[in-house]
């Protein structure tokens, strides 16, 4: 198998071998010839002369959210639009037609609370060529979509959800490289290598800080998933060594289920398959897999299938052995795509008259063949519809993009041929040695960029005079008393394995990833006076509290809405102090008043409960898709997520290209099967 990816799709591209791919794009643009490359040195940057103002980019409302800034429980300030990224003629990323007139699109959610200081996170999805709206609408952002069937307008609308990373940091979701999502690239202007992408990101940042100067100098983090495991280290290296943005306040990078080091991750497929029991020569499918896929309980994985997998790995290893220098090791290695194919092939079969296959992003699920995960996650059809509605396009200042939004643009992926690029893993030691912490996190149920491959990377990495985590042990990670994963840290590098989660961890367990990023950024919630309702988070002996995100009215505390505005904080603090003083005065008054009453009368007096702590199971109906159970209860998918979805060919006229836009179906029970339950994993997953 060959191709690139990040949110990872399974499709073939010529001349590369990767476990990754991208969704087909409906954008029809003529192929561009490879442009001549001039000097690779980056010279002084050409500054953009015409930029929009912050006011021009403000997004006051979206369908379903008429006035986000004054929302009663979750006020939100959103900015969105395009900014130039073309670094200038003759510069890296600007040779010939390459990158000419390119613009990168972004959506920024300002921080809702300020715990001591401001923080900014730039988020990237992978692909290459996959839009960061995956992140903002389905993972770590403040929004989820509401199906048209559930709205009074008959349109797909947006709703606000808790657990987003904008709770304590301003999050900027960037569509890049140019041409991705709402971003713009001229027909012959697509980028080809990572140094070009870095140059465009640096130029974008300079323009971004011109429009939002208050964010320049703020502690900054880069984060993303999948193929962003290639982008992010290159961007970090460029910022550390940038002449255009000297002393850049880069405080860390976070990569989820990233494609980083092919030499470690291709063998990781085989280790993952054996550990999960997906391939166990001569024995039935593992008990865990049988529980989720009862119809397959009688299938035997033969010795021959295991031998084919080992043979594929051997052929791959012969190719990998040709590369001994990480700075010449390519992102994808020929003949190695066969390794993952050999793992998934036995799970492609006829079932109830339909050909199905494993969902490579969540091995607990299956999907219609040949989608194998492309029909997932279940929100995707509504995301497509939402981002193609005229009202949304106008509100998000995306009208200048002539072609319709697509999740992943194949033209971007194809043109990014990486002929002059090496794997990003080569840069990790120098990033760590520059004092920039790195967090790698992995959903335990993802195959395509699985945790075994990530663990091989961190265990083989050498920096600071030592290899891997040395003597640092893996510690259990608990949220409200439930183990949600494991965490390991040494010399600036952290690795988090997250249970019950897929390739898109934030989609499955948003509150866990919220706790994770708060820990990584060292957010101190004790600096939020008046925040009464809290959750506990513990890694080993390190126990902390995190703000309980929920309905402030039901929580019985002060409103949990601060947005980082010091005037609002002062107002809330004053109100809180006034209320406490009033309650104390009332209690003292009642005490002296009732001392003069008969005891029998006093015994009937009790202070009325003003509210209740809202537990994780106290949810509004319909919220379960976005809310992670933090106790022992199970989280079931609602009827919408259980729906069959669209068939492969029923949306071609809308640009879906016959790929299908539904959910990878669980086979155990169409309506009653549990998607995941914290505390119910196999024991093997917890070590």
UniProtKB/Swiss-Prot annotation:
Q: GO terms for molecular function, please?
A: serine-type carboxypeptidase activity
Q: What Gene Ontology terms describe where this protein resides (cellular component)?
A: membrane; trans-Golgi network
Swiss-Prot/TrEMBL keywords: Apoptosis, Carboxypeptidase, Glycoprotein, Golgi apparatus, Hydrolase, Membrane, Protease, Signal, Transmembrane, Transmembrane helix
Quote the InterPro entries the UniProt record gives. AB_hydrolase_fold (IPR029058), Peptidase_S10 (IPR001563)
How is this protein positioned relative to the membrane?
Single-pass type I membrane protein
- Active-site residues, as the UniProt record annotates them: 226, 446, 503
What reaction is this protein's catalytic activity?
A: Preferential release of a C-terminal arginine or lysine residue
Residues with attached carbohydrate? 471, 480
Where along the sequence do coiled-coil regions lie? none
Q: Where is this region: Disordered?
A: 1-55, 610-671
GO terms classed as biological process: apoptotic process; proteolysis
Q: What residue intervals traverse the membrane?
A: 574-594
Q: What biological function has been recorded for the protein in this entry?
A: Protease with a carboxypeptidase B-like function involved in the C-terminal processing of the lysine and arginine residues from protein precursors. Promotes cell fusion and is involved in the programmed cell death.
UniProt protein name: Pheromone-processing carboxypeptidase KEX1
The species is: Cryptococcus gattii serotype B (strain WM276 / ATCC MYA-4071) (Filobasidiella gattii)
């Amino acid at each position: 198998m060959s191709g690139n990816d990040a949110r990872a799709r399974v499709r073939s591209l010529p001349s590369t071998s990767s476990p990754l791919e991208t969704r087909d794009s409906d954008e029809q643009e003529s192929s561009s010839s490879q442009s001549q490359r001039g000097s690779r040195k980056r010279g002084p940057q050409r500054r953009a002369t015409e930029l929009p103002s912050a006011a021009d980019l403000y997004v006051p409302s979206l369908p379903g959210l008429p006035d986000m800034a004054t929302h009663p429980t979750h006020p939100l300030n959103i900015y969105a639009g395009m900014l130039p990224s073309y670094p200038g003629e003759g510069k890296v990323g600007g040779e010939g037609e390459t990158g000419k007139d390119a613009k990168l699109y972004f959506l920024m959610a300002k921080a809702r609370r300020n715990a001591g200081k401001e923080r900014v996170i730039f988020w990237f999805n992978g692909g290459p060529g996959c839009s960061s709206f995956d992140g903002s609408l389905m993972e770590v952002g403040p929004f989820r979509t509401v199906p048209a069937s559930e709205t009074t307008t008959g349109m797909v609308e947006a709703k606000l959800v808790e657990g987003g990373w904008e709770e304590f940091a301003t999050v900027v979701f960037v569509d890049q490289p140019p041409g991705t999502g709402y971003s713009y690239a001229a027909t012959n202007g697509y980028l080809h290598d990572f140094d070009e992408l870095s140059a465009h990101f640096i130029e974008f940042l300079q323009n971004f800080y011109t429009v939002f100067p208050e964010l320049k100098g703020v502690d900054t983090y880069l984060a993303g998933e999948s193929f962003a495991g290639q982008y992010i280290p290159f961007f970090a290296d460029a910022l550390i060594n940038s002449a255009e943005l000297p002393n850049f306040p880069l405080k860390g990078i976070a990569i989820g289920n990233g494609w980083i080091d092919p030499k470690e991750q291709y063998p990781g497929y085989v280790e993952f398959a054996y550990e999960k029991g997906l391939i166990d020569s001569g024995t039935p499918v593992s008990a865990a897999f049988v529980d989720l896929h009862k119809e397959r309980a009688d299938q035997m994985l033969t010795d021959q299938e295991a031998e084919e997998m080992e043979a594929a790995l051997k052929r791959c290893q012969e190719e990998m052995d040709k590369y001994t220098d990480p700075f010449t090791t390519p992102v994808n290695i020929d003949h190695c795509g066969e390794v993952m194919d050999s793992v998934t092939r036995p799970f492609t079969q006829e079932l109830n008259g339909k050909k199905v296959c494993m969902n490579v992003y969540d091995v607990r699920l299956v999907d219609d063949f040949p989608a194998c995960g492309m029909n997932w996650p279940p929100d995707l059809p509504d995301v497509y519809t939402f981002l193609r509605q005229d009202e949304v396009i106008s509100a998000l200042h995306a009208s200048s993009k002539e072609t319709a939004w697509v999740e992943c643009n194949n033209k971007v992926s194809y043109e990014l041929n990486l002929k002059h690029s090496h794997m990003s893993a080569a840069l990790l030691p120098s990033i760590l040695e520059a004092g920039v912490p790195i967090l790698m996190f992995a959903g335990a149920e993802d195959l395509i960029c699985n945790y075994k491959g990530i663990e091989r990377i961190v265990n083989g990495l050498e920096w600071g005079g030592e290899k891997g985590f040395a003597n640092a042990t893996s510690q259990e990670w608990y949220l409200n008393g439930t183990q949600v994963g494991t965490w390991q840290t040494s010399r600036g590098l952290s690795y988090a394995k997250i249970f019950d989660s897929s390739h898109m961890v934030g989609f499955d367990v948003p509150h866990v990833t919220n706790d994770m990023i708060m820990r990584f950024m060292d957010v101190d919630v004790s600096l939020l006076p008046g925040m009464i309702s809290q959750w506990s988070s513990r890694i080993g002996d390190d126990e902390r509290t995190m703000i309980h995100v929920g309905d402030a009215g039901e929580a019985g505390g002060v409103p949990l809405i601060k947005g980082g505005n010091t005037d609002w904080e002062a107002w809330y603090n004053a109100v809180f102090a006034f209320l406490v003083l009033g309650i104390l005065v009332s209690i003292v008054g009642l005490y002296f008043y009732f001392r003069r009453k008969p005891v029998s009368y006093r015994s009937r007096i009790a202070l009325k409960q003003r509210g209740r702590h809202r537990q994780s199971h106290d949810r509004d109906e319909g919220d379960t898709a976005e809310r992670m159970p933090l106790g022992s209860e199970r989280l079931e998918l609602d009827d919408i997520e259980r729906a069959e979805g669209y068939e492969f060919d029923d949306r071609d006229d809308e640009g879906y290209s016959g790929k299908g836009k539904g959910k990878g179906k669980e086979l155990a029970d169409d309506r009653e099967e549990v998607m995941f339950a914290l505390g119910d994993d196999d024991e093997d997953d917890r070590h």
